[in-house]
Amino acid sequence: MRRRSNNMKRCFSCFKEFNESLSVCPYCGHVEITKAEEPIYLAPGTMLANRYIVGEVVGAGGFGIVYKAWDTKLETIVAVKEFFISRLVTRAEGLKNVIISKNSKDEFDYRKERFLAEAKNMAKFGSHRSIPNVFEFFEENNTAYIVMELLRGMALNDYLNQMGGKIDVDFAIVIATEVGKALSSLHAENIIHRDVAPDNIFICTGKEIKIKLMDLGAAKLADSTDDVIDIILKPGYSPPEQYDNTKNIGPWTDIYALGATLYMMLTGVKPDESTNRKISDELVPVSYTHLRAHETDSYLV
């Protein structure tokens, strides 16, 4: 909890203020913590950009750490995504700066630029219903940060697991339609997502359900002339052109991945790798998947 001058402190989970004599937030039940859960995390209460108070960690992976944070200017809760590739950098407990080895610096700097490019890509679509809002991005502590709206809900892959592997046709179509709208907007700006899959689709809960297409970190301009091409692969969802360096990617790359995601939602079975399907492919009819679908829905799979 962050101390205030008027004998009040702020909870690092719900960010409401309460008396500093208490060790448990009376609003959300969050227990006061004075240091990070993991040595590599920023300590709760850390100030970023002289504006954002870091709170609890809401997600962490090999490429970054996402914190819940308090925007002191707008007085609202946001999400702050920290660029942190765990195999390239580390952080000493209690310190803010990331530590980059000399051998890793070139790769880290390159990927940091890609991270900031993700922020710029997302910022172009601030008013889009199906793309997360980005408020700001900046560099600090030897790394970079993206400030975006805090989403409440779960990733599609987690939802599928919760639902036993597959969902009903109507909801699957809603999800695919919203993702399709997001992709249409990206493609209109000549941006290819390259990583459409259940773990990058987020189902927001609240007064109304919203679908968000996440992680534009792999996104690339369709006509890019970069000498370095990252090969982004997600078996079952990546089309053949993503398995080589031919640069032959385009809107069709994302459409294939969306189709594979729709197949997974409807059947509970991840499609075979596209490279295998080029050799031998037998499309499983809807009737074989025990779906209760209309005849007009059979084209979906």
Question: Which ranges hold each PLM region?
Answer:
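AlphaC helix of the eukaryotic protein kinase fold
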Residues: A92-K124
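Activation-segment/catalytic-loop signature of the eukaryotic protein kinase fold
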Residues: F137
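Conserved short submotifs of the Hanks-type protein kinase catalytic core
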Residues: N141-A155
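AlphaC helix of the protein kinase catalytic domain
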Residues: L156-I167
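Activation segment signature within eukaryotic-like protein kinase domains
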Residues: I175-A176
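Protein kinase catalytic-loop region centered on the HRD/HxD motif
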Residues: G180-I191
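Conserved small/polar residues in nucleotide/adenosyl-binding loops
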Residues: T289-T296
